Amino acid sequence: MSENKRIDLHTHSLFSDGELLPSELVRRADVIGHDAIAITDHVDASNIEVASKIAEAVNDIRDNWDITVIPGVEITHVPIEVIDKLANKARSFGAEIIVVHGETIVEPVRPGTNRMSAECPEVDIIGHPGLITEEEVQIAVDNDVSLEISARGGHCLGNGHVAKLGLEYGANLVLDTDTHAPGDLINYELAERIAKGAEIPEEEVPKVLKDNPRKILKKHGII
């Protein structure tokens, strides 16, 4: 994969509440300098099968364009007791990246979502985990679950807290956009500034933007 190109593992298409078809989402990401992008539309038990449609769309793009595209899901606002079951079910439908909608401070996410996600090895990323606790961060580290620094308005208000604890406990931090609209995608330079704004030390920024997301992709044999 190229140097200083984006890897965004949390975006949405028309398969949930995003504005773009998967193909246009990927095309726009490619134009502004992405090496890889995951399409992780919202799911719960009512629509978990959408993972197979995302995978089908992604396969067409993978076969024809020079950008790594990954089918995924974001498990969103579900009873915490079914996170593990839904993660496994999403995998069976072709999802290669599993994000869970974490306890952002701007939505009424069910308490315990961060902890249950951290305990689930099938989960790759806890999206915008808000005021995640030290204990939850340690559990995430133990289970190789990454924590997200978010570029999305509102969700980003917890970035400083997530970065501080993540760095202290050695968590895998990744920076994603949670894109819903064309203007939500960002280039590498803006991602660098967002990471620094979360008080991530300059020497750690390349790990957050490149090394850590690549670890996730390598774990699943995607790259």
Please give the residue ranges for each predicted region.
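Histidine-centered catalytic micro-motifs
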Residues: 6-16, 39-43, 129
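Conserved, mostly hydrophobic/aromatic
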Residues: 10, 29, 41, 128, ...
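Catalytic metal-binding/acid-base residues of hydrolase active sites
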Residues: 12, 43-44, 74-76, 103-105, ...
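Histidine/acidic-residue-rich catalytic or RNA/ligand-binding cores of hydrolases
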Residues: 17-20, 48-52, 109-114, 136-143, ...
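Catalytic domains of carbohydrate-active enzymes, especially glycoside hydrolases
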Residues: 27-37
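Short acidic/histidine-rich active-site segments
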Residues: 42, 171-185
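Extended substrate/RNA-proximal surfaces in nucleic-acid metabolism proteins
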Residues: 48-149, 217-223
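Mid-to-C-terminal alpha-helical segments outside catalytic/metal-binding sites
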Residues: 193-223
